[in-house]
Structure formats: structure tokens, C-alpha cells
A protein has these predicted regions:
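Glycan-recognition surfaces
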Residues: 1-71
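Catalytic cores of secreted or luminal carbohydrate-active enzymes
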Residues: 55-107
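Conserved, mostly hydrophobic/aromatic
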Residues: 58, 137, 166
């Protein structure tokens, strides 16, 4: 028996919340944990994290917003609108499914290196519906590390006998986030932060990657899904993940129609 809702922490920083919510999962269902998307820089840590990461961490529980919408940019308000639509679609699974922990930040081996791949740089969650026909996954990165562009997401709690359609939530990225790398494709020089740069960013959005796989549950859990490679210094297109510090992705798994026909 649980309270209908608990205030997990005043700390709404997405990175901190990932660790806090992982801890709560040992004793409480996500249906009672209140998770908020707050403004940035975060009021507790002054950390700046992407709006999508703040949403995706908060979505694994009772999600809400504590932002001044009047002061947000139009594209941020539109992003929030789409986030709410997505959350409502998957709310039953996100709030009442079975929560599984994968890798997590506390797994760190203590080396503290920002140059070498170490344990504790990733948090993975999977929430699976009671009938195991639907699941939602989170893959969250703490820090970018050079030459570690190839990541694998390992699902948990799926049925080994069900064939799933695994796919990501495709995003669009602001060209400002690439800084003066815009000049690698611009026909004329564009000064970073200039009016021209801002105008380009207003009208040109970069399409994110698409991950789309059909596989049985045992494959998704034990072999994992090799995600599209992250940006590694040069070359960006819709087959490359824009995955900077504190970036994350949500992945969705649904029973494949062909799997239903074979039962």
C-alpha cells in the first residue's frame, strides 16, 4: 500500500533525478513518484540539460512541468506540446508497467576519467506492460567521451517469445548546438552567434537519426540494439546521433503484427 503520490526531491536536475529515481525504484512503483520538468539552468545545480532529457527522465513516473511558459521560446513550447501528447499515449505503461534497471550512474569504477569509456556513464531503464506487449526504454548519457560513439541499448523484462518492433522517438536539432561547425556546410562563412547564424537556426532544423529494428525479446535483451553512431567530430546526417553531454533517448517496443499472426 502506497501514498497516491510522493514528492521525491526538490532537486529536479535531470542527471540527479536519474540517480534519485533509480534509487526509489527499489522500494516504490513509479506510479507514486512525482517527476517535474523544470527550467534551466536548474535551480538546484545550475546545470544546463536538454529539454528532451528533462522530459524523458521525468516521463518515467508522474510527469509534470514547472516552467514559465510565457518566457519559453516558441519551439520549446511546441516541443512540450509534443512531449505531452507522447506521454499521454504511453502513460499506462509508464506509470503502471514493471520497472527494470539496466546500467546506472552509481556503477562507476571510480576512475573519474573523461577520456576513457568507464562504467557509470550511462543509465538504462525499461518499463514493460503487464502483458509484455509494450515497453519503453531510456538511454541516458552523463558525459561525452571521445572515440566511444558506438552504444548498445539492452532491454529488460521482455518476453523472449514475442517479436517486437523497436524504434526511437525522432528529434530535430538546433543548428546552434554545432557552433561554428556550420561552416563545414555553409556556402559562405557564418560567424558563430551572429544574426545570420540565428536566422539559419530559426529556419533550418537538422533531422535526427532513426533506429528501427524488428527482433525477438531475447535478442533485444541479451544481444541488445546497436544504436546509430554518435557524432564523432565530423560528418552529420540522419544516420548519426546528436548525443552531447547529458543527452538521452527514449525507445519504444511494441509486439509486431507478424508475431501475433504466428501465435
Amino acid at each position: 500500500c502506497y501514498f497516491p503520490q510522493i514528492w521525491a526531491s526538490d532537486d529536479t536536475d535531470a542527471l540527479c533525478r536519474a540517480e534519485i529515481q533509480t534509487g526509489y525504484s527499489y522500494g516504490y512503483p513509479q506510479s507514486v513518484i512525482s517527476n517535474h520538468v523544470s527550467s534551466c539552468p536548474n535551480h538546484q545545480t545550475l546545470r544546463v540539460t536538454p529539454l528532451e532529457t528533462r522530459f524523458q527522465v521525468a516521463a518515467f513516473g508522474i510527469m509534470g512541468y514547472e516552467c514559465n511558459l510565457k518566457e519559453m521560446k516558441k519551439e520549446e513550447r511546441e516541443a512540450i506540446k509534443q512531449q505531452i501528447i507522447l506521454y499521454k499515449k504511453w502513460r499506462k505503461t509508464l506509470q503502471f508497467g514493471n520497472f527494470y534497471r539496466g546500467r546506472s550512474f552509481p556503477d562507476s569504477d571510480g576512475s573519474g576519467s573523461v577520456l576513457a569509456g568507464i562504467h557509470g556513464n550511462v543509465t538504462e531503464w525499461t518499463i514493460v506492460s503487464e502483458d509484455q506487449k509494450q515497453a519503453v526504454g531510456l538511454y541516458l548519457q552523463k558525459m561525452v567521451q571521445p572515440n566511444t560513439q558506438y552504444d548498445v541499448y539492452y532491454a529488460k523484462g521482455l518476453s523472449e517469445e514475442i517479436q517486437y518492433h523497436f524504434y526511437n522517438r525522432r528529434l530535430q536539432h538546433n543548428i546552434n548546438e554545432f557552433g561554428d561547425l556550420v561552416n563545414s556546410v555553409a556556402p559562405v562563412h557564418v560567424r558563430q552567434g551572429s544574426l545570420a547564424h540565428q536566422l539559419i537556426a530559426k529556419f533550418v532544423k537538422l533531422d535526427g537519426e532513426i533506429d528501427d529494428v524488428t527482433a525477438y525479446g531475447d535478442t533485444l535483451m541479451y544481444n541488445g540494439v546497436k544504436l546509430k553512431p554518435a557524432f564523432g567530430g565530423t560528418g552529420f546526417n540522419d544516420q548519426v546521433r546528436h548525443f552531447p553531454d547529458f543527452a538521452s533517448r527514449m525507445y519504444f517496443m511494441e509486439e509486431n503484427e507478424k508475431s501475433k499472426e504466428s501465435i
